[in-house]
Amino acid sequence: MATLEICAGSVVSAIAARDGGAQRIELCAALEVGGVTPSAGLIAEARKVEGLTLNVIIRPRGGDFLYDSYETACMEQDIRTCKQLGVDGVVIGALTAEGDIDTVLCKRLIEAADGMSVTFHRAFDMCRDPRKALEDLIEIGCDRVLTSGQAATALAGAGLLKELVEQADGRIIIMPGCGVSSANAAEILKATGAGEIHASARKSVGSGMIFRHSGVSMGNPDSDEYARKETDVNEVRAIVESIS
């Protein structure tokens, strides 16, 4: 069976991922912007969920992947914190202004990881030359790449994903992700030859608030702040069944 990684934003979601049969989670905050580094408190509590490999995204903000020296220092410190909290792996990504892998910065982050596994996240999908980028990541010692094949979804990017799996030839893991569901996970794995897959498997959960102050927003006034996304244990289970 292929390895299933679930993107989780809470302890509740981590438990749902585990109970649904996923082997690993990528712990993130602010999934609405693609994920940023979660708090130390969330990491520590997620670490208590037994039966899961815990990877944590290291991303100081939303937006692009061009980072200054202050953001780099923050990422290094976050990685050291992850190490102290017993995290299994970190998920990193940084590009140069020209759209190449920032190998200098990434080497610093890999060094800070100090033996934890290192996944390069979907910053890969924003680089200008994916084949060169893959060789760069292999050279600096990344263990895995999360990618949609530089397409809107992993299914749409299956052609490039297959080429990347062949190019990697066992030197690095190619993990398809983006738009993965129980309806297409098996198809993506078959089309690409990948042995791991990444999914969000989320559902909307309504707020328990009884009093709701209409007309006041804590963020985007067009978003529903009385609903949040959590991992759907039934969808995780369905993905697992489809790829078993």
Residue positions per predicted region:
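Active-site-adjacent beta->alpha loops and helix N-cap segments on the catalytic face
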Residues: V12, L31-L52, Y70-A73, A94-D114, ...
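C-terminal alpha-helical cap/extension of soluble enzyme domains
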Residues: A168-S244
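Structural motif corresponding to the early beta-alpha repeats
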Residues: A44-K83
